[in-house]
């Protein structure tokens, strides 16, 4: 009987020891302690080469940060935004509208932004007029008492399309926010913007459909050049892109380059920021990721990722206020913009 009790004690002690060792082993060698972050990214079924596969970006970030970075496949900005909102992903590159909505409505933040071809992370939105117009003369007379923007009331406006950033949302946000134009209709209905344009400018305002003659940046500038309108809303580089003085391939409808006058910029349209969820990405993790992204330009492989996967010459560190503040401060005045963006970026 005593022998049985002794053997039972040994067996129990052995079992406890095994359990303790197993638990200790789990604490020392378990992968559960390794932080996993997911970046929402549009993926395809196959790629011509691995250089185009976003998995290469995830692998690079994992190696550079020591974190486990995984892809979360999405097919649209709306799905990326929803993934960030509900915790399925921690980071995503978003367009300006989706990023601003995520910042304002869901508390997302920005850690980086991609550069455009000229190295900037934005482009400026302008009203372009002709130098012999009232607005053009007011812009060139060096007289602070004259207001070129006030001269545009009642003139036919040339927009790049319905609800385009530089061609409509930014300039109309400026005119409404600065008190030049009054909203006509329900302030919670995006369609009121159309009536506001017709009321402040002209019922003949050009708001073209995709594919029509005056659609896009070139279309808005052509609308101005051919006398169909008195002001074209476009970006800072539009005139030189199509009507540069020394360009042999300038468009046939272009006027002399010095005929075009840009009024002071309304504001900036942002490039794509890398937005993140502050609830899951702390400051130290953000710093690791930003450092890795900024270092992409230092190696040939990194430059390949920038060119073939991110489609940008480089990235900069930023935050939501710096990158989206100018844009959001303008478009918030557009009637119905919040509801429109809610619907546009709601998960399908």
Give the positions of each predicted feature.
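A conserved helix-loop-strand patch within extracytoplasmic ligand-binding domains
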Residues: 114-183
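A ligand-binding cleft/hinge motif common to bilobed small-molecule-binding domains
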Residues: 93-107, 174-177, 217-257
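An extracytoplasmic/periplasmic, membrane-proximal ligand-sensing/linker region
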Residues: 34-37, 45-59, 281-348
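Ligand-binding cleft/hinge of the Venus flytrap
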Residues: 57-65, 153, 165-213, 245-250
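Periplasmic-binding protein-like
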Residues: 38, 42-43, 112-126, 185-207, ...
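Short helix-initiation/N-cap motifs at beta->coil->alpha
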Residues: 71-82, 95-97, 183-222, 226
């Amino acid at each position: 009987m005593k022998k049985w009790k002794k053997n039972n004690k040994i067996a129990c002690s052995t079992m406890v020891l095994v359990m303790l060792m197993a638990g200790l082993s789990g604490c020392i060698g378990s992968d559960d302690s390794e932080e996993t972050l997911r970046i929402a990214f549009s993926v395809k079924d196959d790629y011509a080469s691995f250089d185009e596969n976003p998995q290469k970006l995830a692998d690079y970030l994992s190696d550079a940060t020591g974190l486990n970075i995984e892809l979360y496949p999405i097919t649209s900005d709306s799905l990326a935004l929803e993934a960030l909102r509900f915790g399925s992903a921690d980071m995503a590159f978003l367009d300006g509208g989706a990023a601003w909505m995520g910042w304002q409505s869901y508390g997302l933040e920005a850690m980086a932004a991609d550069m455009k071809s000229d190295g900037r992370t934005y482009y400026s939105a302008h009203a372009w007029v002709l130098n012999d117009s009232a607005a053009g003369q007011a812009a060139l007379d060096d007289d602070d008492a004259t207001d070129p923007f006030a001269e545009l009331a009642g003139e036919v406006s040339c927009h790049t399309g319905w609800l385009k950033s530089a061609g409509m949302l930014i300039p109309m946000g400026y005119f409404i926010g600065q008190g030049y134009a009054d909203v006509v209709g329900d302030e919670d209905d995006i369609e009121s913007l159309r009536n506001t344009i017709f009321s402040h400018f002209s019922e003949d305002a050009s708001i073209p459909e995709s594919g029509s003659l005056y659609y896009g940046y070139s279309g808005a500038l052509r609308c101005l050049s051919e006398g169909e309108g008195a002001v074209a809303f476009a970006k800072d580089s539009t005139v030189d892109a199509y009507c540069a003085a020394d360009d042999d391939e300038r468009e046939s409808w272009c006027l002399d380059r010095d005929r075009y006058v840009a009024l002071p910029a309304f504001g900036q349209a942002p490039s794509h920021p890398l937005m993140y969820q502050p609830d899951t990405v702390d400051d130290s993790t953000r710093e690791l990721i930003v450092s890795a992204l900024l270092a992409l330009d230092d190696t040939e492989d990194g430059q390949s990722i920038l060119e073939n996967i991110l489609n940008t010459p480089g990235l900069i560190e930023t935050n939501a206020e710096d990158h989206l503040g100018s844009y959001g401060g303008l478009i918030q005045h557009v009637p119905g913009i919040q509801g429109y963006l809610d619907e546009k970026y709601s998960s399908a």
